[in-house]
């Protein structure tokens, strides 16, 4: 691989479009993107699959290729390394600029590997992003081979994080198979996301106020879980809060089960079809949580 990767140059080109008309692309070379995938994959594998992080940090939910909204999040929260970040997955698909989005996130991971963290979402999986837009974007702008390189990278992402032993973070939610944190630590990477079981549930399950215990999930994958499941899980592991993403919520964040769980969603005006706000959660060093909101853009005059 002849490309020497200049990470600072890559980041500065990705940030050059700040203030440009939303939708302007940044076309890195295919070799540079391959380099981002390979180097970040190395780093993911050198760090645990269950991250143990320290506050202060900012936690973000789904981005889904809404690159200009990702830039707005950083403008609001502080561009790395000004703030520490944990993203909860779903970087690609649905939005128009999955490539810029994932490239900036991987570049920051490489440059600030101890202060910038990315978890795996259910869309960081070949069978899903083959269908919902990322494959087509890779094929149109680069090559199918590059999409496969991303798959190899995504298969190595960590799947959960614990902040200061008190906040449990993952993309989707809990699993009926999850009884000890050691089970997460034992998941071997690289791995695809299976159709069922612990890893699938961490990336796919949803809280549901009408569910007692565990229920069927309308997604046709994984389960729903009720407030009592959340309470028992927190009590058993001495956690204070579950922080997850995976569902659009109107205000960008939404509590469940008497504030024992929070859903974060960071893509405002999701897909151009919703009027939702986007939010990120700021956790200070005393573990106090506050929310920074990206309001949805005003409906453009037709």
Swiss-Prot record:
Pfam families: Metallophos, STPPase_N. GO terms for molecular function: metal ion binding; myosin phosphatase activity; protein serine/threonine phosphatase activity. Its main location: cytoplasm. SMART domains: PP2Ac. The keyword Hydrolase applies. Keywords: Cytoplasm, Hydrolase, Manganese, Metal-binding, Protein phosphatase. One of its GO terms (cellular component) is cytoplasm. Is essential for the regulation of mitotic chromosomal segregation as well as regulation of chromatin condensation during interphase. PANTHER family: SERINE/THREONINE PROTEIN PHOSPHATASE (PTHR11668), SERINE_THREONINE-PROTEIN PHOSPHATASE (PTHR11668:SF300). Belongs to the PPP phosphatase family. PP-1 subfamily. This is Serine/threonine-protein phosphatase alpha-2 isoform. It comes from Drosophila melanogaster. The lineage of its organism: Eukaryota, Metazoa, Ecdysozoa, Arthropoda, Hexapoda.
């Amino acid at each position: 691989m002849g490309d020497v990767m200049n990470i600072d140059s890559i980041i500065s080109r990705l940030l050059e479009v700040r203030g440009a008309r939303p939708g302007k692309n940044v076309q890195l070379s295919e070799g540079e993107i391959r380099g981002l995938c390979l180097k970040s994959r190395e780093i993911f594998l050198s760090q645990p699959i269950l991250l143990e992080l320290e506050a202060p940090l900012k936690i973000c939910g789904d981005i889904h290729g809404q690159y200009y909204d990702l830039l707005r999040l950083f403008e609001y929260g502080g561009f790395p390394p000004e703030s520490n970040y944990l993203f909860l997955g779903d970087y690609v698909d649905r939005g128009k600029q999955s490539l810029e989005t994932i490239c900036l996130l991987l570049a920051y991971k490489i440059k600030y590997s101890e202060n910038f963290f990315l978890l795996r979402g259910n869309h960081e999986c070949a069978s899903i992003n083959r269908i919902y837009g990322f494959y087509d974007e890779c094929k149109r702008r680069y090559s199918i081979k590059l999409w496969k390189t991303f798959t190899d990278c995504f298969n190595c992402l960590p799947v959960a994080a614990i902040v200061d032993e008190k906040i449990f973070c993952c993309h989707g939610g809990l699993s009926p198979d999850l009884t000890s944190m050691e089970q997460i630590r034992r998941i071997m990477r690289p791995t695809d996301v299976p159709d069922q079981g612990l890893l699938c549930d961490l990336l796919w399950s949803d809280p549901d106020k009408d569910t007692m215990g565990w229920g069927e999930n309308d997604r046709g994958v994984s389960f729903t879980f009720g407030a009592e499941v959340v309470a028992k899980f927190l009590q058993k592991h001495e956690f204070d809060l579950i922080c997850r993403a995976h569902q659009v919520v109107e205000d960008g964040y939404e509590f469940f089960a008497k504030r024992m769980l929070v859903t974060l969603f960071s893509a405002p005006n999701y897909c151009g079809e919703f009027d939702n706000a986007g939010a990120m959660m700021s956790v200070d060093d005393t573990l106090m949580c506050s929310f920074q909101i990206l309001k949805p853009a005003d409906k453009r005059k037709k």
